A protein has these predicted regions:
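Multi-pass membrane proteins that catalyze or facilitate reactions on polyprenyl-/lipid-phosphate substrates
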Residues: 1-296
Length: 296
């Protein structure tokens, strides 16, 4: 029963920290030190993957209408807007199959694919090596602090300045690729925060906060699914009934908490900037250093 409660707690922490730009890795490392799951190291790696999948599913559900490129309910505001915007494309395709394809979403996925190139070429092949080199307290703490400072500096520099890119349509392939390079930093250095790195990168490139967050969430789907599937293949599916329940509890909890956090964040950034997360990261980074020096 205690392990089930721990799984519940881990799921909540994953759901909260995966989408807020504060590093899920840093939080899970600390949590596992104070509330350690009584499982093998191999199973814990599997557990991290499964609760991450729960978090990803939340994005798929929340952004379904923005990411599914085929068909749409008639009469919706989104459909009417797309129909007006892409009327010339529909005239060319007539009433055939192409008339059910949302070209703006196809283009979005092409941009996501371009942004994934750095992770595919460098991040995934060398993932184990990066974990071996950098999955340590000092690296996590430094990454937390550096990107915390980056958030504060970027927001201060952009204060009062209008964003250059205010919609997904305005996001170019070049900008998408550059955001992908920032994502690669998170793949190399744990504690950076994948969402934190991509959002900082997007803000530097002139993307609005809302578009930066939305693109970050959509970009997470292939990247995190790919990384999770690689680990699942590596570790296999050999676990007991009790372990299966632990996995299920963690996954469901991560899914539900992710739904809540994503909705909160999208509402929050409409009126506020990201500086509060920068200050939080700096404080957490200092705490990680103190823990490593005196308690680890």
């Amino acid at each position: 029963m205690i392990e089930f409660l721990k799984s519940f707690l881990f799921g909540i922490v994953e759901g909260i920290t995966e989408w807020l730009p504060i590093s899920s890795t840093g939080h899970l490392i600390l949590l596992n030190q104070f509330v350690k799951l009584d499982v093998s190291e191999e199973f814990y790696s599997m557990f991290e993957v499964v609760i991450q999948l729960g978090a990803i599913l939340a994005v798929v559900i929340l952004f379904w209408n923005q990411i599914f490129p085929f068909g749409a309910p008639e009469g919706s505001h989104t459909v009417r807007r797309r129909q007006a915007k892409h009327a010339h494309r529909k005239k060319k395709s007539g009433n055939g199959i192409l008339s059910y394809v949302k070209m703006d979403i196809i283009i979005l996925w092409l941009k996501v694919l371009v942004a994934c190139i750095p992770a595919i070429v460098i991040g995934m092949p060398f993932n184990d090596l990066f974990e071996k080199w950098f999955y340590k307290y000092p690296c996590v703490a430094i990454a937390l602090i550096i990107f915390g400072i980056a958030f504060i500096i970027v927001e201060n520099n952009h204060k009062g300045k209008p964003a250059k890119i205010n919609s997904m349509d305005e996001l170019t392939y070049k900008t998408a690729f550059l955001i992908g390079l920032f994502q690669l930093i998170a793949a190399i250095f744990p504690g950076t925060s994948r969402s934190g790195a991509t959002i900082v990168g997007a803000l530097i490139l002139g993307v609005s906060r809302t578009v930066a967050a939305e693109f970050t969430f959509v970009l997470a789907i292939p990247v995190m699914f790919g990384a999770s599937l690689l680990k699942l293949v590596k570790f296999g599916l050999n676990f007991t009934g009790t372990e299966a329940i632990i996995l299920l509890i963690g996954m469901v909890t991560a899914f539900v908490s992710s739904i809540i956090v994503i909705q909160f964040l999208m509402g929050y950034i409409k009126k506020h900037d990201f500086k509060v997360f920068g200050y939080y990261r700096i404080v957490l980074g200092i705490l990680v250093i103190l823990y490593a020096l005196f308690l680890a």
